[in-house]
Structure formats: C-alpha cells, structure tokens
Amino acid sequence: MLGSYIFTDPKGELYDDTAGYLKSHGYDIKVLNLVNPVNSDGYNPLAHINSELDVDVIANTVVKGQKSEGGSSDPYWDDMAEMLLKALIYYLIAVRPPEEQNLASCAEMVRAASNNGGGNILSEMIGQLPYDHPARMYYKSV
C-alpha cells in the first residue's frame, strides 16, 4: 500500500523533478497552488478541521510555505500573518456555511478589508463574536 505525502514546494522544483517518477510508481499526484489557484487541484484543508491543533497546523503551513527558499523575513510579520489567518479561519467556521469555509474566503476577507481602508470591516465582523471566541482572541493580537 502506498502512503500519503505532502511536500512544500514554493518553486515547483520538487514537482518537476519527482512527479513523473512517483506517477510511474502508482502515486496519485495533486498540486495545491495557493498563489495561482487556476493551476491547482482542489483541496479544502478547512473541511478537515477537528481541533485547535488543526487550525494551528493549517495556518502555520500556509504562512511558512509561502516563504521562498533562502528568503529572509522578519518573524514578527510571519507571526502576525499566522495569527490573522487563524482569526479568519475561526471566524469562517463560526459564521459562514460549510461551502464558504475555505482559504479562498480568507483571501476574499483580506481583500475586502484592504479595499475598504484597512481592518475596520474585519474588526466589525469579528467583533460580533463572543468575547472569548478564538477568532477575537487571535484578531486582537494582530
């Protein structure tokens, strides 16, 4: 039986070097491209959230996976991006129907906030949740 594997491949080099070999050995290859979703297979990691740890892993993987190899960045900004993503995920799970609980909806919320002068819209939306809701706790840290 073949196992399942997930690789972070920001430049696509691992895919280019190994996809043919893996396919020839019976593996089903899927590509999750968050930068260019048109060139991506469908997968919704938010559909599989069962715990706070799942939210942590998804947010960490998305933020850390977008750094280019050898690129430097200030850990502060990575931490802020991760906390914002966690807040958005928790908000979507609490408020939106299952078909809208996805990373595209997270990106849509950030775009809407950017187009309307910053985080006021996000603050209003998340502020409607109970005070101790995880979305509020992560958002107030951003």
Tell what function each PLM region has:
Residues 1-91:
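Switch/coupling segment of Walker-type NTPase motor domains
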Residues 77, 82, 86-142:
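Non-catalytic, charge-rich alpha-helical accessory subdomains
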